[in-house]
């Protein structure tokens, strides 16, 4: 029996006329939609929404939630995603009435406490990153990437340097990097990695030129390796007149140890929903603040949160600003959670976060390299990348290994990324997992490797114990069904 047979869609449960909620009687005159909208925007027939009782709705979504998997359910070693535990004190603080019940349209004088929190969060992020100013406006990581690149574009245009149309990105980069650069109007140039998994400095020198707007880097990179030549790379880019952009996806590996600003980066984006424990993995909301060096401050999105003698306020007087990038001022609830985390941990706690994240990753890497190929055999930072090429020769692919992990109640690691590693298995344990959990996962991975040798079919046909078996993911990606259509 599968999920489709036991759990119909909410639309399929609908019974015409069944009511789940009663609205109070209107205390304002009724008006017609046609009084406000053109006929072209008005439905000819009512929306086909499901009609259920409140109890039916509660049971439907509660049963669905029981089949979900999250950090609170079990180990979630999704590489490059930092699926760490989200402390519940964050949720308690975010639900304080003074935070949860305010509205962004309120007068600034009535939300001074909230503005103070945001300002203090900005100040903390300035210190953590080594930047000169931070804006909390971007809503997520890729949004922060795009915003940072738009600042760089505005900077070059302000200086009359319109020939700088290219952004250099490593071949190991996150996929959002080239996408963000393209959306920001840049051409993407790829710089190769060397045999050690690091940016090839010689190749960088070849591709940098007068048309270079920026170099986008993640440090440590997506292989979990620290770019030791970062200072030299910064000098190369700056001497050519370009800017250095820091993708903050992997900040968990260096937080409170080293700062991007001290490495030579001009723009930084952070993922507060990752590094600073805002819950993520369900599509949002996120928070992707960007930090900038002094010469880029004039181009920050408005408004800019400032502190004056009379209190906190938003400043719109930035004539060179790229303008708003989001209504209001960021995703406030996630920012509250991040602020709570930073204040709870303190500088010493954040340093321990980094140390344990790196320790856990190296411990797992050394334990697993006996059964899986390790393309870059060196000390890693917060994550590491194995290869399933050894298992592929036995007829077992990386995707099979990932599916088999589901039978053991583990979320699979990131697979087939970075693209420069064949049959990639990207593992990020984070700092919040115990040695017992790490050992359990290691034992399972070793068991699966042995199964690939002795009984490959059990891995190839996995998962066996999940409510939903293996799906046709290629078909789902290429021919998605994004809305319900009732059969006639």
Curated annotation (Swiss-Prot):
InterPro entries: GcvPB, GDC-P_C, GDC-P_N, GDC_P, PyrdxlP-dep_Trfase, PyrdxlP-dep_Trfase_major, PyrdxlP-dep_Trfase_small. Keywords: Oxidoreductase, Pyridoxal phosphate. Pfam families: GcvP2_C, GDC-P. It catalyses: N(6)-[(R)-lipoyl]-L-lysyl-[glycine-cleavage complex H protein] + glycine + H(+) = N(6)-[(R)-S(8)-aminomethyldihydrolipoyl]-L-lysyl-[glycine-cleavage complex H protein] + CO2. One of its GO terms (biological process) is glycine decarboxylation via glycine cleavage system. The keyword Oxidoreductase applies. The modification N6-(pyridoxal phosphate)lysine is found at residue 274. GO terms for cellular component: cytosol; glycine cleavage complex. The keyword Acetylation does not apply. Its EC number is 1.4.4.2. Transmembrane segments: none annotated. It is an enzyme of class 1 (oxidoreductase). GO terms for molecular function: glycine binding; glycine dehydrogenase (decarboxylating) activity; pyridoxal phosphate binding. Its cofactor is pyridoxal 5'-phosphate. PANTHER family: GLYCINE DEHYDROGENASE (DECARBOXYLATING), MITOCHONDRIAL, GLYCINE DEHYDROGENASE, DECARBOXYLATING. The glycine cleavage system catalyzes the degradation of glycine. The P protein binds the alpha-amino group of glycine through its pyridoxal phosphate cofactor; CO(2) is released and the remaining methylamine moiety is then transferred to the lipoamide cofactor of the H protein. The glycine cleavage system is composed of four proteins: P, T, L and H. In this organism, the P 'protein' is a heterodimer of two subunits. Belongs to the GcvP family. C-terminal subunit subfamily. This is Probable glycine dehydrogenase (decarboxylating) subunit 2. It comes from Listeria monocytogenes serotype 4b (strain CLIP80459). The gene is gcvPB.
């Amino acid at each position: 029996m599968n999920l489709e047979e036991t759990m119909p869609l909410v639309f399929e449960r609908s019974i015409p006329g069944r009511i789940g909620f009663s609205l109070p009687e209107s205390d304002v005159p009724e008006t017609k939609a046609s009084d406000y909208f053109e006929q072209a925007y008005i439905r000819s027939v009512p929306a086909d929404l499901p009609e259920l009782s409140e109890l039916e709705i509660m049971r439907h979504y509660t049963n669905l939630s029981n089949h979900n998997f999250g950090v609170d359910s079990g180990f979630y070693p999704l590489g490059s995603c930092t699926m760490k535990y989200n402390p519940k004190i964050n949720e308690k603080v975010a639900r304080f009435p003074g935070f949860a019940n305010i509205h962004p349209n309120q007068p600034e004088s009535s939300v001074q406490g909230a503005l103070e929190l945001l300002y203090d969060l900005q100040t903390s992020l300035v210190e953590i990153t080594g930047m000169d100013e931070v804006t909390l406006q971007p809503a997520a990581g890729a949004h922060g990437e795009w915003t940072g690149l738009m600042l760089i574009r505005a900077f070059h245009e302000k200086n009359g340097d319109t020939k700088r149309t290219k952004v250099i990105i490593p071949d190991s980069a996150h996929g959002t990097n080239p996408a963000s650069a393209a959306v920001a109007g840049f051409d993407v140039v790829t710089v190769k990695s060397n045999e050690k998994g690091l940016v090839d400095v010689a190749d960088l020198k070849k591709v940098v030129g007068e048309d270079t707007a920026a170099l986008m880097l993640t440090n440590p990179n997506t292989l979990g390796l620290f770019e030791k030549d970062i200072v030299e790379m910064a000098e190369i880019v700056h001497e050519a007149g370009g800017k250095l952009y820091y993708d903050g996806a992997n900040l968990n590996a260096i937080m409170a140890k080293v700062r991007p600003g001290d490495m030579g980066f001009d723009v930084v984006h952070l993922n507060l929903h990752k590094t600073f424990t805002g819950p993520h993995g369900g599509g949002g909301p996120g928070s992707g603040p960007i930090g900038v060096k002094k010469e880029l401050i004039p181009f920050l999105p408005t408004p800019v949160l400032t502190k004056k003698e009379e209190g906190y306020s938003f400043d719109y007087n930035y004539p060179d600003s790229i303008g708003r990038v989001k209504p209001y001022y960021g995703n406030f609830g996630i920012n509250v959670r991040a602020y709570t985390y930073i204040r709870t941990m303190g500088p010493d706690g954040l340093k321990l976060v980094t140390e344990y994240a790196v320790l856990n990753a190296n411990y797992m890497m050394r334990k697993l390299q006996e059964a899986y190929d390790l393309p870059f055999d060196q000390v890693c930072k917060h994550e590491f990348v194995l290869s399933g090429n050894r298992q592929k020769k036995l007829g077992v692919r990386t995707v099979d290994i990932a599916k088999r992990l589901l039978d053991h109640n583990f979320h699979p690691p990131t697979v087939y990324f970075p693209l420069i590693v064949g049959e990639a298995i990207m593992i990020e344990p984070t700092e919040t997992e115990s040695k017992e959990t790490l050992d359990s996962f290691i034992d399972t991975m070793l068991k699966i490797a042995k199964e690939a040798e002795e009984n490959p079919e059990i891995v190839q046909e996995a998962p066996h114990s999940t409510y939903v078996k293996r799906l046709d993911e290629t078909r789902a990606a290429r021919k998605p069904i994004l809305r319900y259509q009732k059969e006639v």
